[in-house]
Amino acid sequence: MIRIAIPNKGRLHEPTIQMFKEAGLPVLGGSNRKLFAKTNDPEITFLFARAADIPEYVQDGAADVGITGLDLISETESDVEMLLDLKYGGADLVLAVPEESDISSANDLDGMRVATEFPGITARYFKDLGIKIDVVKVSGACEMTPHVGIADAIVDISSSGTTLVMNHLKVIEKVFSSSIYLIANHETAKTEEKIEHIKTALESVMHAKAKRYLMMNAPITVVDDLKEVLPGLAGPTIMKVESKEDIVAVHAVVDADIIFATITKLKAAGAFDILVMPIERMIP
């Protein structure tokens, strides 16, 4: 049995549930109020846990695989197999001070207090800079601490910076960049082939999000021109259409970020009846 630990709440919960659903491993009959949930594979089950606990759960073998933030893995210094950067949930740990503060860099904080939910990362960051600070560990509402005299600055997670601005704080330095990772227990990763299958399934979703499937018709006389526009993964697929005219159907996979320009070129080359479709999964 493979146990996958996933965040039981917070900003990572829903995107993680959705990604596994798209990968073909939906949560069955479970919710974040339960400890466990089944999947459509009898050998795989989900374990709902605090995102901060998942690195150590995986390290210690309580879970075989986990989904959590790189910031939390670094904070706990957990010894786990880093299988895959899932490219969502990106955020930065930033050093921030009150808007009216004269502090403009980490160097100005020598001998001062820095509040954070990430004391490990914060202490290592300032140690590497050769700056002595007092780390004030908090469990939430970190933004409040400079305004009530508990700290001179904070190190906090920020996705857009909106919360900091709302609380009259300004970012002076970026401490750490984080995204969401698929991790595994070292020993289990060596022996369980199904862990590689899970990784492949999630990779297929990631690859598909960046691609689009194009279908179109075109006169057979412009096929060479279309090939120049549509290299595809291994070249476009071209099929004869049963028609009174010499028409072919052309299929190709293209990068999503060039769809607009590609369609313009295809129309100019003579393609018509162009369809653009999302791809659910794409396995190399």
Curated annotation (Swiss-Prot):
Enumerate the UniProt keywords alphabetically.
Answer: Amino-acid biosynthesis, ATP-binding, Cytoplasm, Glycosyltransferase, Histidine biosynthesis, Magnesium, Metal-binding, Nucleotide-binding, Transferase
A Pfam family found in this protein is HisG_C
Q: Which GO terms describe its molecular function?
A: ATP binding; ATP phosphoribosyltransferase activity; magnesium ion binding
**To which protein family does this belong?**
Belongs to the ATP phosphoribosyltransferase family. Long subfamily.
NCBIfam families reported in the protein's UniProt record: hisG, HisG_C-term
What coarse category fits the chief subcellular location reported for this protein? cytoplasm
UniProt key word Magnesium: yes
Activity regulation, per record: Feedback inhibited by histidine.
One GO BP on record is: L-histidine biosynthetic process
What reaction(s) does this enzyme catalyze?
1-(5-phospho-beta-D-ribosyl)-ATP + diphosphate = 5-phospho-alpha-D-ribose 1-diphosphate + ATP
Give the function comment from the record. Catalyzes the condensation of ATP and 5-phosphoribose 1-diphosphate to form N'-(5'-phosphoribosyl)-ATP (PR-ATP). Has a crucial role in the pathway because the rate of histidine biosynthesis seems to be controlled primarily by regulation of HisG enzymatic activity.
EC number(s)? 2.4.2.17
InterPro entries on file? ATP-PRT_HisG_long, ATP_PRibTrfase_cat, ATP_PRibTrfase_CS, ATP_PRibTrfase_HisG, HisG_C, N-reg_PII-like_a/b, N-reg_PII/ATP_PRibTrfase_C
**What protein name applies here?**
ATP phosphoribosyltransferase
Q: Which GO terms describe its cellular component?
A: cytoplasm
Q: Does the keyword Zinc-finger apply?
A: no
Q: Where in the cell is it found?
A: Cytoplasm
Q: In which pathway does it act?
A: Amino-acid biosynthesis; L-histidine biosynthesis; L-histidine from 5-phospho-alpha-D-ribose 1-diphosphate: step 1/9
Note the Gene3D superfamilies from the entry.
Answer: 3.30.70.120, Periplasmic binding protein-like II
> Enzyme class, one word?
transferase
